């Protein structure tokens, strides 16, 4: 089994860098997703550390706190949960935008395919797969 760090990628809602708002509040919903991802991975027998920042701080402060927590563990992968606000589907089209995993290093592709498989086996959310972005700023 593998060992992972997982975190919701923003500060709590209304406290500093709390992510996208509009149809939903990213910092609220990404914590729900993060908790479910952790539950699913643990159910598969993996060791998972929750490295979420729950403090009121800036974007850089949040990132620094997350990195410090993640660096406390020797893991096979670090996962940051974010929600893409690009659809702007205020009226609804009865379709989910889906979930994708963006990687910047091919070495993690096999592990992340397994991660996505576990997530989607237990979900109705569309699987948008693993995508490569060497300039990933996530």
What are the residue ranges of the model-derived segments?
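Short, surface-exposed beta-strand segments enriched in small/polar/acidic residues
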Residues: 4-20
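Active-site-proximal helix/loop segments of hydrolytic enzymes
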Residues: 4, 27-138
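Glycine- and acidic-residue-enriched helix-capping/strand-helix junction motifs
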Residues: 16-32
């Amino acid at each position: 089994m593998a060992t992972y760090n997982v975190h919701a990628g923003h500060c709590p809602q209304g406290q500093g860098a709390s992510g996208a708002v509009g149809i939903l509040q990213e910092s609220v919903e990404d914590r729900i997703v993060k908790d479910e991802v952790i539950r699913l991975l643990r159910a598969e027998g993996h060791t998972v550390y929750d490295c979420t920042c729950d403090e009121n701080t800036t974007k850089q402060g949040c990132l620094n706190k997350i990195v410090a927590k993640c660096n406390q563990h020797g893991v096979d992968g670090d996962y940051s949960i974010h929600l893409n606000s690009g659809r702007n589907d205020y009226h609804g089209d009865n379709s989910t935008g889906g979930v994708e995993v963006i990687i910047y290093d091919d070495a993690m592709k096999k592990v992340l395919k397994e991660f996505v498989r576990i997530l989607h086996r237990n979900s109705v959310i569309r699987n948008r797969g693993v995508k490569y972005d060497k300039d990933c700023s996530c």
